[in-house]
């Protein structure tokens, strides 16, 4: 895991029991890729490393509500993506 002071972009692949989170720089360099058990506190812990107001994209799939609530509570700008519309 690298320290990075600039704006971060985060992609989240949310599944029923686990989630994959990838943090990147503005240039697209991967800072961290982790797989966590779905838990609000664990998500908040990983997202704390993304700095203030990270841009987060999350697939709008079944059960995304809790994650969006937790991300927004932590100051993230959340963007929902349609599963069939993202390439």
Residue map of PLM features:
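Phosphate- and other anionic-substrate recognition elements at nucleic-acid/protein interfaces
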Residues: 1-87
